[in-house]
Amino acid sequence: MSHCKFEQPRHGSLGFLPRKRASRQRGKVKAFPKDDASKPVHLTAFLGYKAGMTHIVRDLDRPGSKMHKREILEAVTIIETPPMVVVGVVGYVETPRGLRSLTTVWAEHLSEEVKRRFYKNWFKSKKKAFTKYAKKYAESTQSINRELERIKKYCSVVRVLAHTQIRKTPLAQKKAHLMEIQVNGGSVADKVEWAREHFEKTVDIKSTFEQNEMIDVIGVTRGKGNEGTTARWGTKRLPRKTHRGLRKVACIGAWHPANVQWTVARAGNAGYMHRTQLNSKIYRIGAGDDAKNASTDFDATEKRITPMGGFVRYGVVENDFVMLNGATPGPVKRVLTLRKSLLTHTSRKALEPVSLKWIDTASKFGHGRFQTPAEAKQFLGTLKKDVA
């Protein structure tokens, strides 16, 4: 005989409160990997734009698994990563209250796409940003060198200011994304010199990450607007004959205390939350100028990573890209922060070398039949539109 349960686990986690929209669209890096002076100087993060998803076929190399040495099909995410431009360096001093910035040194010339980041309305502005700062370089570089020496003398953490080249992507936005990226490896002086040498120069994705590396993806999830308690918290639907709605919380608390507790599931905003996704594996780092960046040893067809017709609602990937295992936060066109992992990975899954056998490049708009335009033309023959 069935009976009522008087105790049950609560619905939804309280660890993600407040469930409100993120303050900014770019993912914030709240912790960087631990520095190791024995390694060469390198960046610990990179910015990219989510282009879309596809799927791949590969042989699983995992002894003991039932799928060992057998083909598996996996979903992958393509993130376009044009080279980033270094435009500044920031020095941080360790204090009893944590890290505090000592000074910031900017490059002499900044492109228009990064200057737009400092204006709400670029069209109506006077566009005077960094004009006085550029005069320091014109008059004398002594003050610039003095600030760099202060960073070498007093700082323990060095981070560079780098921005994306958003004009190279299919996005309509003209305002580049700017962020601080920690520089690890070598001494503090080596880091400052590395930053100074790379002022106004580009840094590509291959100098930061490598294939088969486990990384973290930081971004803002897809926004879903206002949702009720059932969709937002996963509460149970009430019985069919319930008065005034089923997808609600029947009891929102006791008479006293005479207010609704913060732990009670309520309707409100869902999605557009800042999230950090750990342990995404890099399956491939492709070059934008390679006509065979989607070919493999088993599939020698000359094809690019962009599917036929382009990625839906994104377009054509013409720059360097990163192929990550599984899904990532956010919709297409969302800027994502790729960060080196904070952990030392020892699991077989993390250390497994990945060798791709086939990458799907069929159209993602509907059920794609062909992998390349040449394959479609060979099958369909000469069409009427080709003759006219």
From Swiss-Prot:
Component of the ribosome, a large ribonucleoprotein complex responsible for the synthesis of proteins in the cell. The small ribosomal subunit (SSU) binds messenger RNAs (mRNAs) and translates the encoded message by selecting cognate aminoacyl-transfer RNA (tRNA) molecules. The large subunit (LSU) contains the ribosomal catalytic site termed the peptidyl transferase center (PTC), which catalyzes the formation of peptide bonds, thereby polymerizing the amino acids delivered by tRNAs into a polypeptide chain. Residues 1-10 have a biased composition (Basic and acidic residues). It is found in: Cytoplasm. There are 2 genes for uL3 in S.pombe. The keyword Ribonucleoprotein applies. The gene is rpl302. GO terms for cellular component: cytosol; cytosolic large ribosomal subunit; preribosome. Belongs to the universal ribosomal protein uL3 family. This is Large ribosomal subunit protein uL3B. InterPro entries: L3_arc_euk (IPR045077), Ribosomal_L3_dom_3_arc_sf (IPR044892), Ribosomal_uL3 (IPR000597), Ribosomal_uL3_CS (IPR019926), Transl_B-barrel_sf (IPR009000). Keywords: Cytoplasm, Ribonucleoprotein, Ribosomal protein. Residues 1-34 are annotated as: Disordered. SUPFAM superfamilies: Translation proteins. The keyword Lipid biosynthesis does not apply. It holds the Pfam family Ribosomal_L3. GO terms for molecular function: RNA binding; structural constituent of ribosome. Component of the large ribosomal subunit (LSU). Mature yeast ribosomes consist of a small (40S) and a large (60S) subunit. The 40S small subunit contains 1 molecule of ribosomal RNA (18S rRNA) and at least 33 different proteins. The large 60S subunit contains 3 rRNA molecules (25S, 5.8S and 5S rRNA) and at least 46 different proteins. uL3 forms together with ES39L one of the contact sites for the signal recognition particle that targets ribosomes to the endoplasmic reticulum membrane. GO terms for biological process: cytoplasmic translation; translation. Residues 18-31 have a biased composition (Basic residues).
